[in-house]
Amino acid sequence: MLSNLLLTGLPKSGKSTLLENFISLVGDRKRGLLTREVLRNDERIGFDVVTSEPETARLARVDFASSLRVGKYGVDTSLFETVLRPLFNVKEGELLYVDEIGQMQLHSVEFGRLVQRYLDAPQLCIGTVSTVYEHSVISALRERKDTQIIEVKVENRERVFSIVKEVGERYLKGETVLEPITI
């Protein structure tokens, strides 16, 4: 039985925006996190994580002095992990979401545990996953029988959003079985 829906695609394909737009339509019955870019003078200087609690933490910055690096960004897992703790307290009926299961986030072992917790939960979990980075957590989730992965492309973004919205609405009405989706 499918209970997880993961959106994948190249950077800038729209997968995070799609998930964020969907999550904004869901009421209070949700738990998870979104990764947002931080801009200064129209230039990306880092990434923050915003949770459903709501809490915000800096995840990465160009000026972080950290041994954990992703490109030009230093990653601070201690700040990140502080806001993750409450997200483990999953309540029945909540829709779970994670943006993004990617290289910066997976520097945190706690984040890997949270992803596993969400994917193993009986609730619907909708997330985004990197296509440009491999990690044991990403490899394992690609093999899960309870997970459907949909590639988001410019030409199918609107269709994928409609599908995600429909699946989420059905789940929140009490339908717990996710049917295989064809794009």
Residue locations for each model-derived region?
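N-terminal phosphate/diphosphate-binding loop that engages ATP/GTP or pyrophosphate donors
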Residues: E20-V70
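Conserved lysine of the Walker
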Residues: K15
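Hydrophobic residues in beta-strands of the RecA-like P-loop NTPase core, especially within AAA+ ATPase
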Residues: V98-D99
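Generic solvent-exposed, charged/amphipathic alpha-helical segments
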Residues: E20-S24, R85, K165, E169
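Helix-adjacent hinge/juxtasegments
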Residues: S52-E94
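Hydrophobic anchor at the beta1->P-loop junction of P-loop NTPases
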Residues: L7
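P-loop (Walker A) phosphate-binding loop of NTP-binding proteins
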Residues: L10
